[in-house]
């Protein structure tokens, strides 16, 4: 497995910065290319995927027809892209509506895409930054809400025999 070492790009991808900011739940934080919100998304998300995701609201289900309307993209092309976005873990989908129509959801990071990015071992091996992304997004949002949570992440608990 490749070791994760990250150097922020000199020219960050603007769409990835915007998407990272849209999804983050870190209170009062502006996402930069040095943040896990950036490097986690940047590893797997294309600019085209980011454009589509930016037309969605976090945790608000949308049908294919609604996303077609929001993006102006051709239905068949968009459906394939949404499937790819779901396969990498950026989106989730369900049929939890009265018509049982497939709907896509842009989740928050944890629980959500930070976890989904780590569900395929080959994806983690190819992009080890997603493991760091998940670990960081499990704790960073809590810093301003519950400062003690971050310090507890490094405790070693005794083994109970």
Whereabouts are the PLM-identified features?
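A short, conserved structural fragment
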Residues: 86-96
